[in-house]
Amino acid sequence: MSEQNNTEMAFQIQRIYTKDISFEAPKAPQVFQQEWQPEVKLDLDTASSQLADDIYEVVLRVTVTASLGEETAFLCEVQQGGIFTVGGIEGTQLAHCLGAYCPNILFPYARECITSLVSRGTFPQLNLAPVNFDALFMNYLQQQTEGEGEGAAQHQDA
């Protein structure tokens, strides 16, 4: 039996948690008197760190900025964290797991948190579209191979 067959891929979610939350409405209450046709910008960033053998923390930072003209109506940021057991893979497969698969698991939790914060700020409902973290990760890898990538920041306009 080969050594590769003895090493099985292991994946387990140990914990999903909110690491940091921020909501700002710098122009409230004046912003509520304006017609609501905002420009919404969505910024995503992922970071991962190894906590122990085969145990990793992945943090997905989601920042939503809604602007009316030149003024910021609200700024909402959530850092959604997760602790994952990931074993039996390494290299690009491990990077994909930590940079795409785990953020894909964390995103619905961050999206729900942002939706709740925006609602509590009494702004109209905000529905964030699903994010293709696999495509973002592939773009990141392509930038790295071309030497253009600076950091792991990933951005998308909503």
Curated annotation (Swiss-Prot):
Entry keyword set: Chaperone, Cytoplasm, Protein transport, Translocation, Transport
Gene Ontology BP terms: protein folding; protein tetramerization; protein transport
Cell compartment(s), UniProt: Cytoplasm
Location, primary (coarse class): cytoplasm
Transmembrane domains' residue ranges: none
Keyword set includes Chaperone: yes
Alphabetical list of Gene3D superfamilies matching this protein: SecB-like (3.10.420.10)
Annotated GO MF terms: unfolded protein binding
Name of one Pfam family that matches: SecB
GO cellular component, one term: cytoplasm
Highest taxon listed in the record's lineage: Bacteria
Function: One of the proteins required for the normal export of preproteins out of the cell cytoplasm. It is a molecular chaperone that binds to a subset of precursor proteins, maintaining them in a translocation-competent state. It also specifically binds to its receptor SecA.
Family: Belongs to the SecB family.
Subunit structure: Homotetramer, a dimer of dimers. One homotetramer interacts with 1 SecA dimer.
Protein name (database record): Protein-export protein SecB
Originating gene: secB
